[in-house]
Amino acid sequence: TPLEKLVQRKISRYFFEQRKRQLRKLEEGLGKTVTRELAVETMLLDLEEENILLKKVVWPLYLEIGQEAGKSLLVELGADPEIFTLVDTPAIAALEDKLIKVVGINETVREQLRDTLIEGMGQMETTAELMERVKQVYNFAQSRSLTIARTETGQAAGLARDAAMGQMQVVKHRWVTAGDEHVRVSHQELNGMVVERGQLFPNGCRFPCDPGGPAGEVINCRCVAAPL
């Protein structure tokens, strides 16, 4: 979807800029007379600062995705999409909770950087070799940008659609898959299943892409809940 592609571009750009910051800090820190493990810690980017930057990137995206998804749901119901608002809905609180958890992306990258740099310094690698290790970590992070974008977009949209259903007093909804060969087996089995809104589907999700659902049922999900 266009919004998914927008999120992917933003996340990919964030990783690109973060890589530049990390390479610069690594280059500046190499050569200091400290223990190897301590040297690595001092040459990694400040996690708190990076988390602030990441949140600034994703929060406007969450709001845009949520607003568009909520309006789309109202159109499906034949209602005026302009009456939808995220303000004072459970979706806003849930999106704020997502904002707290999204920093896990940075924590994963930082741990990978720490491990690979300790290994490289233990092998007395050159500056060029250590910097290549950093690039490899970010190459992997970049390769995950579509998965991250799809998951973040789906979760923000799922929350907003659920909020819109609440606004329109929808009682039941149906699980609808993307209908192609990439749909996971557990979701193929759920396709067409109807439950009361707020109750769990058999896979532990309140709705497709539910941030509170099991990770294995949410990551890369493209399903939606259709109101009845």
What spans do the regions from the language model cover?
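N-terminal leader/targeting and assembly helices and adjacent pre-domain segments
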Residues: 1-139, 228
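Acidic, glycine-rich two-metal-ion catalytic cores of nucleic acid-processing enzymes
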Residues: 140, 144-228
